Regions:
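Structured catalytic core of nucleotide-sugar glycosyltransferases
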Residues: 3-20, 63, 67-71, 86, ...
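A signal for specific C-terminal beta-sheet/loop modules enriched in small/flexible residues
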Residues: 39, 51-53, 65, 111-116, ...
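Conserved beta-strand hairpin/beta-sheet module of binuclear metal-dependent hydrolase folds
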Residues: 1-52
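Metallo-beta-lactamase
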Residues: 90-121
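A generic structural signal for alpha->beta connector loops
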Residues: 5, 83, 105-107
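Residue-level detection of beta-strand scaffold positions
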Residues: 21-23, 31, 58-60, 87, ...
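Active-site metal-binding motif and surrounding structural segment of the metallo-beta-lactamase
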Residues: 42-92
Length: 121
């Protein structure tokens, strides 16, 4: 029987975007995990995950820690293209939805993208 380990990977950190992966591994095989923050483009995320032997199929949700742009920059894109649940606090969810409503009033279609991705924690 193999040992199951938990690994934390810093995929990107700094003002250019923050994104982390927390997962369970059996040796080199990922058994599932979560993505923490959405600060990098989906294209960049896929590339970084690939470099670590992972894909977007290896996480089941995205956890948002706070609403600084370097942590949420690509959240709408993740919601639209990945169809993963988004986990965050009620206060942060309200703040993100409030911003989204302002964008929607300008003709943006972000509201539906974020709304479709939310789950209660």
């Amino acid at each position: 029987m193999s040992d199951i380990n938990v690994k934390f990977l810093s995929l990107s950190s700094g003002s250019s975007g923050n994104c982390y992966f927390l997962g369970r591994f059996d040796g080199e095989n990922c058994l599932g995990g979560i993505l923490i923050d959405a600060g990098v483009s989906l294209k960049r995320l896929k590339s970084i995950l690939y470099d670590h032997g992972l894909s977007t199929d290896d996480f089941g949700a995205v956890l948002i820690t706070h609403d600084h742009m370097d942590h949420v920059r690509s959240l709408a894109s993740y919601c639209k293209k990945l169809s993963k649940p988004i986990w965050t606090s009620d206060v942060l969810a309200d703040a993100l939805l409030s911003r989204t409503l302002k964008l929607a009033s300008l003709g943006a279609t972000v509201l539906k993208l974020v709304e479709d991705g939310w789950n209660d924690v």
